[in-house]
A protein has these predicted regions:
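Short, conserved charged micro-motifs
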Residues: 24, 425-431
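Active-site palm subdomain of RNA-directed nucleic acid polymerases
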Residues: 395-418
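Metal-dependent catalytic core segments for phosphate chemistry
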Residues: 145-146, 196-230, 345-378
Length: 432
């Protein structure tokens, strides 16, 4: 992937200027020696937000979610506290650190290589993002990004701040534009549509979902129709029934892997206008409409448990669960053979009661925080998620080979999407 001209001396310099100016502003506002320090800033915010010394503290941490929640009600905060929280939010914009990573990783021809690691995700075998971490780029919503780019390349910090206000946010939106195609080419982006919903329905044999994807493809409307008994033709803009689409959407995205109300909340159900009281009903209705998918969770868990208990292979839904080992090296694995032939591995598995008092599969995994081997446990829904994402990954792998066979260059890909550095006359990838 190639960088735009002016990246190093424009974008890179602007990050340092932006950070320093915000830090100077915070020091001037608070009088603190290091306003980036949580130990210094939390007491300052608490003391300046109280009308009386006995009032409760405003906050006890400066996590992203905490700052965001406080700023949603900034009308109730003193002006200096609100201003400092906004500065903190801008200073904490981790996405602009990607510019530093870009500069570090840049190689010959202003290109960055090695952005994905093959089989980087241990459980599913998916590619993992490396270096610049392009798998979680911030979205851009500014309509005048080209003008913002010119200001940055000219190192015009004051102009950028005067026109756009939040400089770190503007810089983060420009990250995508720092990557450009090769000379005479353009980026062509293609993605799978609702790939995980398709795979789990196919694997479980949820026929009505398969029929939706084979015809109109409106899975959110169709799900709402199944859940609430409303004709799908009524769930269109302008009709009161259209409000049900949101419930169908959040349920489809959140509940496929045995999740409940907490999964709906994590998917943003409350922020999308749903109330906590109606969430259990949504869970129940979705499960009633998707009995085959629910059955898949339990079939997967039972097959895995049986393989562990009997040391005999167990098959269900096109999957084969087995306990495998290597006597020479003393290794043992619970394996899951996918329909395509690839296997998933759960190292050093054993059975033990989980926190709910149920017999569950435990295995060793590298902790995301500790980066050390530690014991983890799993269940039917979680294993189903691993299996579905692994099958979707294999679909992507086949597609990458098909694209390469057509003489096109994939310069990056995410779990369900490919970015191709294509000649200007390429417009679509039908049949790939």
């Amino acid at each position: 992937t190639r960088f735009t001209d002016g990246f190093e001396f424009g974008f890179g310099a602007e990050i340092g200027i932006s950070t320093q100016k915000l830090t100077d502003e915070a020091i001037s506002l608070t009088g603190l020696q290091n306003p980036n320090s949580q130990q210094q800033l939390v007491p300052w915010l608490n003391s300046h937000s109280k009308e009386h010394p006995d009032d409760p503290d405003l906050l006890d941490n400066l996590q992203k979610a905490t700052v965001e929640d406080l700023l949603k009600n900034k009308g109730h905060l003193p002006e200096d506290v609100c201003q400092m929280l906004e500065i903190r939010q801008q200073l904490g914009k981790t996405s602009i650190k990607k510019y530093v990573a870009m500069d570090t990783a840049r190689g010959e021809g202003d290109r960055v290589r090695g952005l994905t690691q093959y089989y980087g995700a241990n459980r599913t075998g998916r590619w993992a993002g490396r270096l610049v971490q392009l798998q979680n780029l911030p979205r851009n919503y500014l309509r005048t990004l080209d003008y913002a780019r010119e200001l940055v390349k000219a190192k015009n910090y004051d102009g950028l701040r005067m026109l756009y206000g939040n400089v770190p946010d503007t810089l983060s939106q420009l990250i995508r534009t720092a990557f450009i195609p090769s000379e005479g080419h353009k980026f062509v982006v293609a993605d799978f549509s609702a790939i995980e919903a398709r795979v789990i329905a196919w694997l479980a044999g949820e026929q009505w979902v398969n029929e939706v994807f084979a015809t109109h493809g409106k899975i959110y409307e169709a799900t709402a129709s199944q859940m609430f008994g409303v004709p799908v033709e009524r769930i269109v803009k302008g009709n009161p029934e259209y409000a049900l689409r949101q419930k169908g959407k959040v349920a489809t995205l959140a509940l496929g892997y045995q999740g409940g109300t907490n999964s709906l909340i994590a998917m943003g159900a409350l922020k999308q206008g749903l109330t906590e009281e109606e969430l259990p009903d949504i869970v129940q209705r979705w499960r009633q409409a998707n009995r085959q998918i629910c059955g898949l969770w339990y079939a997967v868990e039972n097959a895995a448990l049986a393989a562990m208990q009997t040391a005999q292979p167990q098959g269900t839904n096109g999957l084969i669960f087995a306990l495998e080992g290597d006597l020479i090296y003393g290794q043992s694995f619970l394996t899951v053979r996918l329909p395509g032939g690839r296997k998933l591995f759960y190292p050093k598995p054993f059975l033990q009661e989980n926190r709910f008092g149920r017999q569950a599969i435990h295995y060793y995994a590298v902790g995301q925080q500790t980066r050390k081997w530690e014991v983890d446990n799993t269940y039917g829904g979680k294993m189903t998620e691993n299996i579905v994402q692994a099958i979707a990954r294999d679909c992507l792998a086949v597609t990458l080979e098909r694209i390469a066979a057509r003489g096109l260059q994939v310069v990056f890909h995410v779990h369900d999407e490919v970015i191709i550095d294509a000649p200007m006359d390429v417009h679509r990838l039908g049949g790939a």
